[in-house]
Amino acid sequence: NIVLGFDNFDAYVGNSPKYGASIGPVAGRIAGASFDLDGQTYHLEANNGTNCNHSGSTGWDSALFSVESVTDQEITLYTERADGTGGFPGNLKIWVTYSLTEAGELEISYRVETDQDTLVNPTNHSYFNLSGNFTQPINDHVFQINHQGLYPIHPDGVPLHTVDRESPIVQHLYQAMLLEDLFKDSDPQIRLVEGLDHPFALPEGHENAGFFYHQPSGRFLTFKSEAPALVVYSANFVDETVHLQGKPMVQHNGLALEFQTVPDAIHSDQAEKVILRAGQVFTSKTSYHAIAKK
């Protein structure tokens, strides 16, 4: 298994690292735990300092989805979300589909409908550790991303609204970088969070957003998405109450690849990308492909 997870269902309740979780309606931080939409101010749960992160304690990751359909190749899960939940407007209908393609890819697709103008910016929060040993950090993995720049973050984790295309760490990640070297790097953004917790801008219509490689096992993961950004989180925060494979969680034990629009977009010139109007339908698809190199 190369995706971090628990051995039993109960462990997923109150799952603070959000292993494998579907995050929504809005992934990432919303500055000030509030936003304005159509002339009205909406106040959200401040669960990350003064900010709202991953839609607060009532986000989709706390919901139990029902199985709407299942075949040999895919499963579609469904849930509904009442107007005002977590402070967000709109009655939502939410479908998440997990599919296996003929090419051997895993696809995750989202479909969301609303009866009021609202915010929608979901993601999947799975962590990858290609060694399969979740008690060890991913220092011996190589990571590469075909990005158009990194969004630096403030000390509270909210991204700036400009991208950095020039710093050495940004250039290294475009070429490919051993994560042990990244975790030791003196770049102020890396030191701020002891790793990565940063959005990267992705080229529109890309065929390959990057790769994750574990040379000792030969396991090689590629990924792509219709989303315009990828938040990369390297499990910097340690919750010692979380146990995996019989041992307490260690820092940097996995890499979360969170495809979405850049967090806090509602407070930027990308606001329209996260506003879903009444009667409209939001869709997004992300694909992962794992192989073993000889």
For the regions a protein language model found, what residue spans apply to each?
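An exposed, glycine/acidic-rich loop-and-rim segment of catalytic or binding clefts
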Residues: 1-294
